[in-house]
């Protein structure tokens, strides 16, 4: 019994010492809970991005934000009027601005009555009266019209098979085109006595002159130069805007060395350099015929005449109830 009392404490002490020894030499010894240096982190942990998912999303949103992105490249649009579609008015404004083709506005000086049954195809201001050529088969005519009242002073009707088109006066002769009949007429400008017929191979749309030659359109981007006596073709003008063809050239007027051309189915007039064929400006007549003046019977803008005394233009359209005297407003 005495021996047991002595050995038992020794065994307990030995056990404690053995436990301490084992714990102090064990490879799995417990260490304080501290972070390891970055150089000792696992390879997998070192390769993982040290960015939280939310931070990644935030970065992505920032990169894709329009405010953080560089400005988009400038896109240049070009107006091309072709047989399939015609650019809208707003498109003209946007694209002409991007191409640096000047856009002219207008100021209405006076408003005059216009025969709403006149399908205007050509318009001339001479000796204080209008000469007007009208279209539609069975309704085509050549007229003298009083500006202030809109009354018809003189009129001859074309044979029913002809669809009348543009007119011009050079000297004492008045020239009138027809649309698809490949036939034009020459009249005495005062009496409307027909002097001759003449053929041409294309459609007839608009006609004007530069004082020496006739200039004619056929609805394409080409203008034709004719000898006024023989009606032979002397040359062509290819009309382009920033290198692109301008189609549907219609009624023409020659003003200050430039050709003004209605572009069919638009409210715009192309101002054309006859030497190069380049469009030097666009006259935007959007809204010139107010909604209150529209009855639903009106057709497109067509008809340009020049008043040299006032340096103003007369503008109307097919079946329009009004005719406008305007002054162009060129942006500074």
Predicted features, each with a name:
Residues 1-6, 13-106, 332:
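Intrinsically disordered, low-complexity Ser/Thr/Pro-rich tracts
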Residues 127-128, 171-172, 211-212, 256-257, ...:
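Short coil/turn segments that connect the beta-strands within blades of beta-propeller domains
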Residues 96-116, 147-151:
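A short helix->beta-strand "capping" segment at the edge of beta-propeller domains
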Residues 120, 249, 296-305:
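Signature of short aromatic-glycine-proline-rich micro-motifs recurring in repeat-based ectodomains
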Residues 146-150, 188-192, 228-231, 273-277, ...:
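Short loop/turn segments that connect beta-strands within beta-propeller blades
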Residues 130-137, 174-181, 216-220, 261-265, ...:
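Conserved beta-strand positions in repeat-built beta-propeller and related beta-rich domains
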């Amino acid at each position: 019994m005495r021996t047991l009392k002595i050995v038992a404490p020794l065994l307990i002490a030995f056990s404690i010492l053995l436990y301490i020894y084992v714990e102090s030499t064990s490879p799995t010894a417990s260490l304080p809970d501290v972070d390891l240096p970055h150089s000792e982190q696992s390879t997998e942990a070192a390769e993982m991005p040290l960015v939280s998912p939310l931070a990644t999303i935030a970065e992505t949103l920032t990169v894709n934000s329009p405010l953080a992105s560089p400005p988009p490249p400038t896109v240049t649009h070009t107006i091309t009027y072709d047989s399939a579609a015609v650019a809208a008015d707003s498109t003209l404004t946007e694209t002409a601005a991007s191409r640096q083709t000047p856009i002219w506005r207008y100021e209405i000086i006076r408003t005059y009555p216009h025969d709403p049954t006149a399908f205007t195809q050509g318009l001339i201001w001479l000796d204080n009266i209008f000469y007007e050529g009208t279209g539609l088969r069975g309704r085509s005519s050549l007229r003298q019209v009083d500006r202030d009242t809109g009354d018809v002073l003189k009129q001859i009707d074309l044979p029913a098979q002809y669809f009348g088109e543009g007119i011009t006066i050079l000297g004492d002769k008045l020239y009138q085109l027809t649309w698809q009949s490949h036939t034009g007429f020459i009249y005495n400008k005062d009496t409307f006595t027909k002097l001759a017929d003449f053929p041409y191979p294309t459609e007839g749309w608009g006609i004007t002159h530069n004082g020496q030659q006739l200039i004619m359109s056929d609805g394409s981007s080409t203008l034709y130069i004719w000898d006024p006596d023989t009606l032979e073709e002397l040359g062509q003008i290819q009309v382009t805007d920033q290198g692109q063809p301008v189609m549907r050239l219609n009624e023409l007027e020659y003003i200050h060395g430039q050709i003004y051309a209605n572009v069919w189915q638009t409210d715009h007039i192309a101002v054309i350099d006859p030497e190069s064929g380049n469009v030097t400006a666009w006259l935007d007549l959007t809204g010139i015929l107010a909604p209150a003046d529209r009855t639903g019977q009106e057709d497109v803008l067509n008809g340009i005449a020049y008043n040299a005394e006032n340096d103003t233009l007369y503008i109307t359209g097919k079946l329009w109830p009004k005719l406008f005297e305007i002054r162009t407003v060129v942006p500074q």
